């Protein structure tokens, strides 16, 4: 039974049901210091009803309460403080972890419901930059977390492969491009063209107009325009898939904006049939004043569609195809207003399922405090950063363990894992500065620190070379360090649920750091392999810790090497 439930049931019985179990569970607190117990109930909540001071109420409850399952229950001022039975709790938690293994913390909350996750979405014909990392790894982690809780995540790479920028790129290719040069080095050459034509379009309205005309041709099915566009797309995907392979991220569908180009007329006609479209300066808009939003521009004066038109078609397609229980969009915080407009237009059209669409925004990655910008050519390729992280990891592994057999493979796991972990430990809505020195460090709150704790446990277990009978373990939790680990292990299922509820992988990453820290304190204070009556209990404790560390890392898309 969950410790909050245990405390709440005992309290509700002690106060004759004045507060129900759920009411009590909602106000149970954790004391600031573990010396004051594991959980605390503030008696202020009963003062008015019982017409007594909170201090008196706390004292009366502590005397009356059934202490079964607790080491002791005491009154501390206006609080009733509960100390859990350490040995019983440890036995229960460790047996549960060792029995369930990687499935510890699993739940069937989602009951198989589909959850499409719009993620990564790099732009065709542009480098896969560090700026694309967040959507990719946050989306991948949320998918793993949701799958653990019984949902069916559907990872969709909504490639940026449609829009006026491709008209401009075709313009640049026709003016300056060379097929052989681009074929030899596609992304770099296309980036040069993109930066050059954007600079020209800013200065010369005729260049901008030419780009607009080429995009219009794409929308109208012009053979030459689509042939060049498809070539850009094909060479880009080859590069992207290589990078996804390094990241260890896969997708269920690659569905770019172009996939929906023939589905937009239907959504525009639907809005028109419901009298939602209004003309404004020759363009078609949906008035969203009642939502305190600016009008949504659906079609421009020249008939070209916009980002929101394509997203309306996308949302309708996903509902029809996947019948989702939730539809997540892991897209940067700068798009918040766009998603508010998107949901509002769908709501106006009578699609209440739009309530199940969730924008999962995130903060920006900078380097040296500066924003990445492809238009200006200020771009750092993610692949180069990953390769550099792996090189740094290999040097550290060489220094720590020169005789490690599979150094190169472990270096990949540590280097790539370091970059992903650093991103995911950052609160989603916050940004961070991309700093490889900090990321790949084996000290501090980093991925390598957590991985090293897991590898250290595996090393101890190999050295012990002893099979532990989980049904016959003596677990005497006599030290504070072991108890901290037990409490952390017990909390893991709640951590997974909290991460899912808030679309927040950082909850898992921070938990993994705290569990690794708890183990390292235990390792420093306890002779784990001492041959005494408690040896099997200690091995069971660290084995359970290893299982949960590995699973926490897996939920973040980070490997857990057995050796480092």
Curated annotation (Swiss-Prot):
HAMAP family: Arg_tRNA_synth. It is an enzyme of class 6 (ligase). The gene is argS. Pfam families: Arg_tRNA_synt_N (PF03485), DALR_1 (PF05746), tRNA-synt_1d (PF00750). InterPro entries: Arg-tRNA-ligase, Arg-tRNA-synth_N, Arg-tRNA-synth_N_sf, ArgRS_core, DALR_anticod-bd, Rossmann-like_a/b/a_fold, tRNAsynth_Ia_anticodon-bd. One of its GO terms (biological process) is arginyl-tRNA aminoacylation. This is Arginine--tRNA ligase. Monomer. Its EC number is 6.1.1.19. NCBIfam families: argS. It comes from Lactococcus lactis subsp. lactis (strain IL1403). CDD domains: Anticodon_Ia_Arg, ArgRS_core.
């Amino acid at each position: 039974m969950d410790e909050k439930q245990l405390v709440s049931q005992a309290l509700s019985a002690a106060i004759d049901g004045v507060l129900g179990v759920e009411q009590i569970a909602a106000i149970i607190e954790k004391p600031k210091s573990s010396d004051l117990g594991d959980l605390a109930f503030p008696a202020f909540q009963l003062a008015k009803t019982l017409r007594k001071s909170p201090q008196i109420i706390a004292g009366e409850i502590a005397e009356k309460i059934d202490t079964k399952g607790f080491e002791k229950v005491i009154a501390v001022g206006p609080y009733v403080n509960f100390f859990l039975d350490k040995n019983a709790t440890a036995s229960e938690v460790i047996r549960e972890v060792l029995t369930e293994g990687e499935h510890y913390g699993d739940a069937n909350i989602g009951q198989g419901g589909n959850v499409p996750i719009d993620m990564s979405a790099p732009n065709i014909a542009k480098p896969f930059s560090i700026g694309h990392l967040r959507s990719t790894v946050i989306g991948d982690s949320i998918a793993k977390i949701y799958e653990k809780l019984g949902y069916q995540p559907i990872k969709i790479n909504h490639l940026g492969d449609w829009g006026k920028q491709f008209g401009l790129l075709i313009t640049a290719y026709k003016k300056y491009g060379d097929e052989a040069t681009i074929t030899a080095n596609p992304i770099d050459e296309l980036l040069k063209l993109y930066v050059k034509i954007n600079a020209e379009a800013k200065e010369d309205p005729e260049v901008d107009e030419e780009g607009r005309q080429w995009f219009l041709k794409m929308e109208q099915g012009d053979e030459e325009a689509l042939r060049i566009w498809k070539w850009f797309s094909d060479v880009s995907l080859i590069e992207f898939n290589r990078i996804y392979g390094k990241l260890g991220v896969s997708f269920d569908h690659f569905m770019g904006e172009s996939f929906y180009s023939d589905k937009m007329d239907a959504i525009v006609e639907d809005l028109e049939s419901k009298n939602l479209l209004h003309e404004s300066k020759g363009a078609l808009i949906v008035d969203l004043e009642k939502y305190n939003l600016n009008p949504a521009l659906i079609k421009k004066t020249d008939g070209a569609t916009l980002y929101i038109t394509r997203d309306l078609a996308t949302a309708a397609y996903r509902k029809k195809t996947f019948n989702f229980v939730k539809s997540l969009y892991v897209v940067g915080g700068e798009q918040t207003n766009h998603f508010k407009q998107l949901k509002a237009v769908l709501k106006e059209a009578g699609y209440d399922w739009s309530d199940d669409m969730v924008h999962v925004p995130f903060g920006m990655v900078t380097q040296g405090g500066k924003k990445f910008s492809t238009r200006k050519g200020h771009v750092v390729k993610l692949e180069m950063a990953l390769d550099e992280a792996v090189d740094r990891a290999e040097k550290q592994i060489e220094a720590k363990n020169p005789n490690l057999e599979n150094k190169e493979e472990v270096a990949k796991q540590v280097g790539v894992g370091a970059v992903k972990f650093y991103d995911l430990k950052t609160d989603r809505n916050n940004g961070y500065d991309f700093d490889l020195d900090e990321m790949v460090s084996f000290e501090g709150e980093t991925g390598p620190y957590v991985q090293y704790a897991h590898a250290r446990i595996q090393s101890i277990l190999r050295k012990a070379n002893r099979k532990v009978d989980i049904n016959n373990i003596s677990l005497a939790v006599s030290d504070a360090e072991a108890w901290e680990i037990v409490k952390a292990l017990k909390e893991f299922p709640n951590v997974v649920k909290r991460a899912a509820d808030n679309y927040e992988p950082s909850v898992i990453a921070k938990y993994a750091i705290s569990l690794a820290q708890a183990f390292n304190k235990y390792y420093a204070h306890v002779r784990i392999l001492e041959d005494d009556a408690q040896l099997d209990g200690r091995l069971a404790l660290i084995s359970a810790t290893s299982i949960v560390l590995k699973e926490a890392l897996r939920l973040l898309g980070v490997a857990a090497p057995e050796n480092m």
